[in-house]
């Protein structure tokens, strides 16, 4: 309606798969089975921060299991479900199976970019903020796509993900509120968002900037758009992050005896 209600900056706070097309085909990156097999065959690696609760969510959400924030700030979670199409334990075992591959590396963003730059890592689950690093590492092979499917009880299940946005905040108690609001308005205007998007790979929230040729043609943003069909808005309570990370680390290490007990 032409009115400014806030200062939205980006609409690309999600994750997808970067990969080097010099080593991997579109068929290779369509599933975790194919991806890891191709990497193992070539003596290369694939990265994802499985021990990060933000990324781990994608497996369980893709299998139709729930994690969401209630009005009182608590969470509703059925990742230990035994009466759903895909049991939580089956999903957890599928994650552990992925992590057992000698090509799979559980790593954070900075390490993944370093591994890609030295030629070791040919694919990584990451976000738009990592675009410049993977562009440099993969060169003319730089590519991106939606997240792979993974195998649960013999079925190929599409991974889900989180989707989110970033805003510029203004301190209402600053001595220079007016100037601060003008700065926020400048940072988030169409021209600035377009420039930031071109420089960093982030996706603008401004609709005109988002459809500009320079932005719309970016592989990472095209991949994010493709993944958005399987993404959920990030609506989880604060008590999710710690236990989620602990669960992810346990699945990475295989440090459990009873997966149902682990989920419970």
Briefly describe each language-model feature range.
Residues 23, 37-41, 96-98, 110-124, ...:
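Short helices/loops that flank or line small-molecule/ion binding pockets
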Residues 30-33, 104-117, 129:
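Short helix-initiation/N-cap motifs at beta->coil->alpha
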Residues 34-48:
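Short loop->beta-strand "edge-of-pocket" segments that line small-molecule binding or catalytic clefts
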Residues 74-108:
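Glycine-centered hinge/linker elements that transmit conformational signals in sensory
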Residues 136-200:
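Extracytoplasmic/periplasmic substrate-recognition and gating elements
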Residues 1-30, 50-76, 162-170, 241-250:
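Periplasmic solute-binding protein
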Residues 162, 199-205, 209-264:
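C-terminal capping/gating helix-and-loop segments adjacent to ligand/active sites or protein-protein/ligand interfaces
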Residues 122-127, 143-145:
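Paired acidic/hydrophobic, glycine-rich loop segments that form the ligand-binding mouth/hinge
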């Amino acid at each position: 309606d032409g009115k400014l209600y806030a200062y939205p900056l980006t609409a690309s706070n999600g994750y997808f798969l970067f990969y080097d097309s010099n080593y991997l085909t579109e068929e290779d990156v369509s599933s975790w089975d194919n991806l890891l097999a191709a990497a193992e065959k070539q003596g290369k690696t694939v990265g994802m921060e499985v021990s990060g609760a933000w990324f781990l969510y994608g497996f369980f959400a893709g299998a139709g299991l729930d994690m969401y924030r209630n009005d009182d700030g608590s969470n509703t979670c059925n990742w230990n479900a035994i009466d759903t199409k895909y049991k939580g334990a089956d999903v957890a075992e599928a994650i552990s199976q992925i992590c057992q591959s000698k090509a799979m590396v559980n790593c954070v963003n900075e390490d993944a970019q370093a591994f890609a730059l030295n030629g070791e890592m040919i694919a990584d689950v990451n976000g738009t903020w990592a675009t410049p690093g993977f562009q440099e590492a993969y060169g003319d092979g730089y590519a991106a796509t939606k997240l792979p499917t993974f195998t649960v009880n013999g079925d190929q299940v599409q991974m889900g993900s989180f989707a989110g946005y970033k805003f510029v905040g203004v301190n209402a108690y600053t001595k220079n509120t007016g100037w601060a609001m003008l700065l926020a308005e400048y940072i988030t205007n169409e021209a600035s968002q377009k420039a930031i998007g071109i420089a960093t790979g982030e996706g603008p929230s401004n609709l005109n900037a988002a459809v500009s040729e320079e932005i719309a043609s970016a592989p990472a943003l095209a991949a994010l758009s493709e993944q958005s069909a399987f993404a959920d808005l990030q609506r989880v309570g604060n008590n999710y992050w710690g236990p989620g990370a602990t669960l992810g680390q346990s699945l990475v290490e295989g440090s459990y005896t009873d997966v149902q007990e682990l989920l419970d």
